[in-house]
């Protein structure tokens, strides 16, 4: 293991330790400080008539869990960005030219996925978007991106939609893939031809257990297995 690898490993440990410690202290302090505030975070989450009949302890417990889940997700997103910055240039938006034909081609591909005319999806399905448009009717489009990463050493580009929970959203699988493909097309239009661009749909943990395959069929209807992290 090289010194550079060891240094990076220690840096990651330091980021994780600092992030978790800061989160725990801040989470405890914020909720204890707001306990008597009727407009505090927990007190604004307890007004559920169905939970209320179970008693005040259950009311506060469920509110605390909901607040923890939301706050933890925000912390993990920030921590992931800080870790990514050790190796990648990190951006959170993609903007550039997109042709009407590319937009239509993306829509047609998604329809084929929906009707299962193409199954299973593969990363080869959308490589035609690498062809730069020759038409003049280009529009500038901008997408917010969870993580647009550029490898500082290789120049490879990675577009990642990250879900902090263990469940990739079945209902939004199509719209997530559409946004990623449009970003893929924009980068293809603006970067040199041989630039590597990869697309991923990721989650912080696997609801089926780490190392086990995804079984969410709606997600796999639109995403290739090697696009799921």
Task: Give the predicted meaning of each segment.
Residues 1-99:
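Nuclease-adjacent, charged terminal/linker segments that flank catalytic cores
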Residues 86-90, 150-156, 189-194:
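Secondary-structure boundary elements
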Residues 95-97, 152, 160-164, 203-205:
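Short loop/turn segments at strand-loop or loop-helix junctions that form parts
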Residues 96-153:
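Active-site metal-binding core of divalent-cation-utilizing nuclease and nuclease-like domains
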Residues 164-187:
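Mg2+/Mn2+-dependent nuclease catalytic core
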């Amino acid at each position: 293991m090289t010194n550079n690898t060891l240094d990076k490993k220690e840096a990651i440990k330091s980021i994780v330790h600092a992030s978790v410690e800061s989160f725990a202290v801040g989470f405890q302090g914020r909720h204890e400080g707001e306990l008597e505030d009727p407009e505090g975070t927990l007190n604004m989450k307890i007004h559920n008539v169905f939970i209320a009949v179970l008693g005040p302890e259950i009311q506060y417990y469920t509110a605390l869990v909901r607040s923890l889940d939301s706050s933890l997700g925000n912390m993990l997103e920030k921590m992931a960005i800080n870790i990514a910055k050790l190796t990648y240039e990190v951006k959170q938006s993609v903007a550039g030219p997109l042709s009407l034909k590319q937009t239509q081609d993306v829509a047609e591909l998604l329809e084929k996925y929906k009707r299962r005319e193409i199954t299973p999806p593969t990363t080869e399905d959308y490589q035609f978007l690498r062809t730069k448009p020759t038409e003049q009717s280009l529009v500038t489009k901008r997408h917010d991106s969870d993580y647009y990463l550029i490898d500082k050493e290789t120049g490879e580009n990675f577009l990642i939609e990250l879900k902090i929970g263990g469940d990739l959203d079945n209902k939004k699988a199509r719209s997530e893939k559409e946004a990623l493909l449009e970003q893929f097309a924009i980068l293809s239009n603006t970067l040199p031809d041989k630039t590597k661009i990869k697309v991923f749909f990721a989650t912080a943990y696997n609801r089926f257990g780490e190392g086990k395959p995804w079984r969410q069929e709606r997600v796999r209807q639109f995403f290739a297995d090697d696009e799921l992290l």
